[in-house]
Structure formats: structure tokens, C-alpha cells
Design a protein with these regions (language model features):
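Conserved catalytic core of the tyrosine transesterase superfamily
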Residues: 1-218
Length: 218
């Protein structure tokens, strides 16, 4: 019964979760307006997806790490390993708007007077450095607004960035460098996901997919 085989087709557990480009676009369009929180949230979402950052890397960004003129971020990953990440046009524009007088400066005026608060790129409503927990809450809130459920996380945006680049033809080495993986094995998991999805589609759609293939595990 071909229908029975189709019913059990799915990408195996353990691969990084990613969302498709249409859903990413819906998410990135949820912050509407020009208030400081809107500018901040838009910059967070665009930077997480556009640069493929870990949430800890995003919250650790300081003003000197952002080069809007040359469109680069200086990022410190695991073990304080430094890398330079390119900024796409949308992420650059969102960061520029947030770091203007209408965005970050408004929240900075509310800060408890610490040098670190003055340096951090992303701030909370009190003008203090935004925490990882706060970033997760922002991403989750906009995920709900975009109709993506309540389990959207910053890491899903990182995974989506890598997946979409590979699907567009980027080399695995370039994606490894972008994500800051010390081992290419960490990046190869994304190609495994693509292969699993291709196999699932093949088994569902190809009229000559054989019975023994349908029974195979991924």
C-alpha cells in the first residue's frame, strides 16, 4: 500500500531544526513600526538569521564589534575564538536603525550607569545588557506572532541560515567558517538533513520507489 509508506515518511530526529524561507520572511516582517523595541527586535531577528549567530554571540556583541561601513561583525564564539562574519543588507540596515538615536540610544538613557551597558549592542527595557533569556523570549514572541508556534528559538534561526545557504549552493567549508564550527563534522549534519529530506520526498513522489527502500531507516 503506497499510502501506508507515505504516512511514515519523515526527517529523522536529531537533525538541526530549520524553518523554510517563507516562514523566515513572515517572522522577519513581524516587528512593525519605528519605536525602540521594534527596532531592537528587528535587528535581533535579522542578525540571528542573517549572520547565523549563537544567542551567546549575539548578546556578547559590543558596539566596537559592529562595522557598518564595511558590513562585518566581529564575533567571539566558543572558547572566545574570534571570527569575522559578513553582514547582509537587511541585517546591516536593521542594525543601523537600531543603533541610531531612535533605537539603542533611547534605551541607553534608562540604564543603570555601568560601562558594560554603554558598550553592549543589545539592551533590555532598563537599558542594561540584554540576556540570553531575554533574547529567547523576544524570538519566541515574534514566532507566535508569525504563526510559527511557541517553540521557535534563536538556534532555529542559526540552523535555518546554514540550511538555506547550503541549499543555495554555498560550500560546506564556507558555512563552517560562517558558523564558527571548529570541526567540519558539526557542519556536515546539515547536509545529512538535506539528504534525509530528499530521500523522504523521493519515496513519496517517485512512482518507482522500491518497497525495500521504503522500509529502510534513515
Amino acid at each position: 500500500d503506497p499510502g501506508a509508506a507515505i504516512a511514515v515518511l519523515k526527517v529523522p530526529q536529531g537533525f538541526p531544526k530549520a524553518i523554510d524561507i517563507e516562514k523566515v520572511e513572515r517572522l522577519l516582517n513581524t516587528p512593525v513600526g519605528d519605536g525602540p523595541y521594534v527596532l531592537r527586535d528587528r535587528a535581533i531577528l535579522e542578525t540571528l538569521y542573517g549572520a547565523g549567530l549563537r544567542v551567546s554571540e549575539l548578546t556578547a556583541l559590543v558596539v566596537d564589534d559592529v562595522d557598518l561601513e564595511d558590513s562585518f561583525l566581529r564575533v567571539f564564539g566558543k572558547g572566545r575564538k574570534e571570527r569575522v562574519v559578513p553582514l547582509g543588507g537587511h541585517a546591516k540596515d536593521a542594525l543601523a536603525a537600531w543603533m541610531s538615536g531612535a533605537g539603542r540610544e533611547v534605551l541607553l538613557e534608562r540604564r543603570k550607569r555601568t560601562d558594560q551597558a554603554q558598550r553592549n549592542v543589545f539592551l533590555n527595557k532598563f537599558g542594561n545588557p540584554l540576556s540570553r533569556k531575554g533574547t529567547w523570549a523576544i524570538v519566541r514572541r515574534h514566532g507566535l506572532r508569525a504563526g510559527l508556534g511557541d517553540d521557535l528559538t534563536p538556534h532555529v534561526l542559526r540552523h535555518s541560515c546554514a540550511t538555506h545557504m547550503l541549499e543555495a549552493g554555498a560550500s560546506i567549508r564556507h558555512v563552517q567558517e560562517l558558523l564558527g564550527h571548529s570541526s567540519i563534522r558539526s557542519t556536515q549534519v546539515y547536509t545529512g538533513r538535506r539528504e534525509a529530506e530528499l530521500k523522504a520526498i523521493y519515496l513519496e513522489k517517485h512512482p518507482r520507489a522500491s518497497a525495500h527502500l521504503i522500509e529502510d531507516t534513515f
